[in-house]
């Protein structure tokens, strides 16, 4: 069977998916183990009817709304492939900017103790631990299920880390030179306009927060300096609508901070120090 014949099948099932031709190519690549070059040149695919039936079954799952990354159990993030499933959020490209800024600042330096809160898949913490000289890495999350995914990814990339089930700092001990956090920050009223695939498939616990999405962020800002060394840094992601509110909270706390924008020129994360 030729690639184009298989692609016709895929496009039929993916007709209501945005960028369906691109996804059809990804399905063929990931299911049959072909390169995009093989797909472009319409290579022959050696496959049984059983394999075609399984392929169609996965297409049907995608057509029902399940995110592609949960079907094939991975997401590319900062030049690495992370395992993901329904226990964790799918990493977003904007979060790579936080990782990149942190790497730019700490490249060539040694970090004694590093904490990644709300770690989810571990994509932030494991990326930084892979790129930087960090002596001690702690990945923490309120969800035991999320920590299992983070453990799997840490094993894949040979990262030695401590894993702690913790509601923010509830089970955290000691001070850290670097803290990163990508907390639940989506305002609850955004539920009615978010993509249905996000609402139905991604863990809502890791997405939404009360008080215009600021409830967990406010708690973190109140507590973080007790766990940060004098010259330590915090990098925190937030919703594009929250820049002014976060600036006000940090000005009241009298800490140094700088807000950074994402690819769409929207406020997206903050770098801040202690008191």
Task: Please state what every model-predicted region is.
Residues 1-32, 39-40:
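Non-catalytic accessory regions of SAM-dependent methyltransferases
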Residues 14, 106, 154, 224, ...:
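Conserved hydrophobic residues forming the short capping helix/wall of the S-adenosyl-L-methionine
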Residues 27, 65, 95, 124, ...:
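Residue-level signal for inorganic ion chemistry
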Residues 30-104:
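Conserved AdoMet
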Residues 69, 186-189, 241:
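Active-site beta-alpha loop architecture of Rossmann-like, nucleotide-cofactor-dependent enzymes
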Residues 83, 211-273:
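Conserved Class I SAM-dependent methyltransferase catalytic core
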Residues 97-193, 197:
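Conserved SAM/SAH cofactor-binding pocket of Class I
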Residues 185-216:
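Mobile active-site "lid"/loop adjacent to the S-adenosyl-L-methionine
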């Amino acid at each position: 069977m030729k690639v184009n014949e298989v692609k016709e099948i895929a496009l039929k099932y993916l007709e209501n998916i945005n960028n369906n031709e691109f996804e059809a190519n990804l399905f063929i690549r990931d299911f049959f183990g072909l390169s995009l070059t093989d797909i472009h040149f319409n290579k022959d695919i050696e496959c049984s009817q059983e394999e075609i039936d399984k392929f169609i079954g996965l297409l049907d799952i995608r057509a029902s709304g399940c995110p592609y990354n949960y079907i094939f159990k991975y997401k590319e993030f900062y030049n690495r492939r992370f395992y993901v499933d329904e226990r964790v959020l799918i990493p977003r490209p904007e979060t790579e900017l936080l990782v990149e800024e942190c790497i730019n600042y700490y490249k060539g330096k040694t970090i004694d103790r590093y904490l990644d809160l709300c770690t989810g898949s571990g994509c932030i913490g494991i990326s930084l631990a892979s790129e930087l000289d960090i002596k001690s890495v702690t990945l923490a999350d309120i969800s035991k299920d999320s920590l299992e995914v983070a453990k799997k990814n840490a094993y894949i990339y040979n990262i030695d880390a401590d894993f702690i089930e913790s509601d923010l700092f509830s089970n955290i001990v000691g001070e850290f030179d670097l803290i990163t956090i990508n907390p639940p920050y989506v305002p609850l009223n955004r539920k009615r306009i978010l993509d249905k695939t996000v609402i139905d498939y991604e863990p809502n616990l890791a997405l939404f927060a009360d008080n215009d999405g600021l409830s967990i962020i406010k708690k973190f800002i109140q507590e973080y300096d007790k766990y940060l060394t004098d010259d330590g840094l915090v990098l925190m992601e937030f919703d594009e609508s929250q820049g002014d509110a976060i600036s006000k909270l940090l000005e009241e706390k009298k800490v140094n901070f700088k807000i950074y924008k994402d690819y769409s020129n929207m406020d997206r994360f903050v770098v801040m120090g202690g008191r």
